[in-house]
Regions:
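Acetyl-CoA-dependent GNAT
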Residues: 51-54, 58-71, 79-149, 157-162, ...
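Active-site acidic-Proline motif in GNAT/NAT acetyltransferases
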Residues: 147-149, 153, 181-182
Length: 225
């Protein structure tokens, strides 16, 4: 993997919104992480999402979110959740929110979006779960999804490595996330990435209650070992 990346996620405590937006709007070619994936997968670019990506992110979100849901979550609940979380308006808001960073994995040849990730600073994702983290301040991985046909190709790993880069760049002490306790594939992946369980939370998809595992990957303490 070739890694030459300038941090994209510019939000730090005390930074003004104007400075953040100015940095994000710079030529994206100078903020690109090129990931060479195993054949037959083409190379892809991990980069900051742009306004003209929103329609494709919306489509990708609707395709990938159901894969993370257990059988107890019905189609009506999934549709309700997607309409709430992945609307064009909501996705556009991520681009101008100083504490959010929307990232995409783009096929360099076809320009199709293969995956995406949303990072959220601090406790916004779940204040109660955040209080149980071991290392703070922490950067949350709110969403990380890859097209099913590209599972196992290294795209999710590349997105997570990019999240680690941003965590260090902004001086955060850890990464954290939550996933459904029945999503064994995701739990195995996060364990391989160095996350460990630190608690649980209740998360609703539509009207259906889900029990999530909260996981954390300390970075500052692991760096000192």
């Amino acid at each position: 993997m070739e890694s030459a990346v300038t941090p994209l996620f510019r939000f730090c405590y005390g930074e003004s919104l104007d400075d953040y937006v100015s940095a994000r709007n710079k030529d994206s070619s100078s903020f690109t992480l090129i990931v060479m994936l195993s054949q037959p997968t083409p190379s892809c670019t991990i980069r900051s999402a742009r306004e003209d990506d929103i329609s494709a992110v919306n489509e990708l979100a609707y395709i990938t979110f159901p894969m993370a849901c257990p059988d107890s979550v019905g189609p009506e609940d999934i549709i309700e959740h997607c309409a709430s979380q992945f609307s064009t308006e909501r996705l556009l808001n991520h681009l101008c929110n100083i504490a959010h960073y929307l990232v995409v994995a783009e096929d360099q040849n076809s320009h199709q979006l293969l995956g995406y990730m949303l990072l959220v600073a601090g406790a916004e994702m779940d204040p109660t779960a955040y209080e149980n983290l071991q290392e703070k301040p922490s950067l949350g991985v709110d969403k990380l999804y890859v097209r099913k046909e590209f599972h196992g190709c290294g795209i999710a790993t590349a997105l997570m490595e990019h999240a680690v880069e941003q965590t260090f760049a902004c001086g955060y002490s850890s990464l954290w996330l939550a996933t459904n306790s029945y999503n064994k594939r995701a739990l195995r992946f996060y364990e391989k990435q160095g996350f460990t369980p630190v608690g649980t939370r209740i998360y609703y998809v539509g009207k259906t209650r889900n029990d999530d595992v909260v996981l954390e990957k300390p970075l500052i303490s692991s760096l000192s070992k």
